[in-house]
C-alpha cells in the first residue's frame, strides 16, 4: 500500500537521476526513507496501519481553498513529510523513527498550513504522556 502512495512516488521522483528540482538534502532523505519503505533497514519500517489511519483522518479534513478532502488536496512534498514523520516506526519499540522534522521552503508556500495539518494529525494520533 505504501509503495502506491503519493509520498512514495514523490520520494522516487526526488531520487531520479538528473532531477535538479529538489535540493541535495531532500534527495538524501528521500533515498534513506525509500530504503526504510522498501524494507531494507533492520531498525525501522513504514507502518501500513499508521498510514491507513493518517489517510482516513485526511479524508475527513476539508482543504479550505480547494474544497476537497486533504487526502486529495495536499501537495506531494507534504505527503512525503507526513508519511515519513507519522508512519515510519522503530522496530524495537514501535515508536516514531523521526522525532524532528524540518520543512525549509520559500515564503508563501503553505508552511503554516502544512504545520497546522501536522499539528492536528499529531493531536489526533499521538498518545498522551
Give the positions of each predicted feature.
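Phosphate/NTP-binding elements of NTP-utilizing enzymes
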Residues: 1-129
